[in-house]
């Protein structure tokens, strides 16, 4: 394992030049303190977890120091925000410090969020607050632990530096890791500014470094677009299967690698509500839970438009038509696993949709715990345990009979079924009220709760003695908390 000063950098994106990013030094926050760090994320850089105990660790990730090989850059991009095109966005408070190469030869972007003003700050102060930084850290590591494609978070630092949002808050920084921070909006920026040569350079960079398998295809750019579409379909299927609502699916928040990032007012569903809106700024429900699938398709169409200088329009249209079937196949596969089913039958989609409709009617069923409880006992016994959470008992009993018949046709042993279901159905889920509790403690200077919650959520499928309170249903006050976009 390496020390902080032993990391190896290879800053490929920075070498693209000033058309793609601007050199900016981070603005440090005062008297930095480490709030929480992820040893799992540190391992991606071959970084010794003990390094987090050093004073220099907080200083590095609060903007006070830089590695000699770091080349901090603010990336330029644009994007469609709530359906309207914004011609120039970019990193308004985050900096790509550089790319670290680990022993396996993998490149990891180090992106410091809350690092101060950049040319793209758009009248903002370039800061992030402790509240939003903790939320991003927890979500990044938890989604990864759930098996949902996501950026990673290495640590959060905070300080006494004040920042103003709806009220005065503490400044903080979060260090985000990802193989790339290229977004759909990067391609849109060069397309709409008619910088087609730069568009070509960007695409060749992405192809060579992230989709090299596409280079051997007859049409590498088209193969790359299909790969992006397939990865996005898989990511959205995971969101829907696990009840994750992103909240701000603008094209500048869509990763070219099909990973979840730019966490804002996200939420996991408590009770099932297909129309749940987690962002209180989303007045029309554009980014509601049920809209995430069509919005992902819309965003891919926006990316396709930006690629028209390089790919024939008709071929892009044909590829876009693959999205919904690919999504549905991924989603059904995940839901079969959540229901403990190991084979595919023609009526599986109807079985899943009937269950969700029953959940929607009463909203008394905890979405995550339902699947966990369903695997705890033999199917007939488990159905009796969860039955009282439903309003339409006759409808649930009819569904239960079909589910039992389905399980009997598979003939699984209960021990195997339980182990299989518990491996995909989390006992612990990142609920907004839990995040809010640890945020309030951290704002008061107590970082123990956020560290404990992070540790629990990093093993969401494992029963952890003494941590039962994190597996409980949320109290009524903890449901449907409105989360602001401000961060």
Swiss-Prot record:
Its cofactor is Mg(2+); Mn(2+). Keywords: ATP-binding, Magnesium, Manganese, Metal-binding, Nucleotide-binding, Nucleotidyltransferase, Transferase. The active site is at 252 (proton acceptor). It catalyses: L-seryl-[protein] + ATP = 3-O-(5'-adenylyl)-L-seryl-[protein] + diphosphate; L-threonyl-[protein] + ATP = 3-O-(5'-adenylyl)-L-threonyl-[protein] + diphosphate; L-tyrosyl-[protein] + ATP = O-(5'-adenylyl)-L-tyrosyl-[protein] + diphosphate; L-histidyl-[protein] + UTP = N(tele)-(5'-uridylyl)-L-histidyl-[protein] + diphosphate. Its EC number is 2.7.7.-, 2.7.7.108. InterPro entries: SelO. ATP binds at residues 90, 92-93, 113, 125-126, 176, 183, 262. GO terms for molecular function: AMPylase activity; ATP binding; magnesium ion binding. Mg(2+) binds at residues 253, 262. NCBIfam families: PRK00029.1, PrtAdtaseSelOPseudom. This is Protein nucleotidyltransferase YdiU. It comes from Ectopseudomonas mendocina (strain ymp) (Pseudomonas mendocina). The lineage of its organism: Bacteria, Pseudomonadati, Pseudomonadota, Gammaproteobacteria, Pseudomonadales.
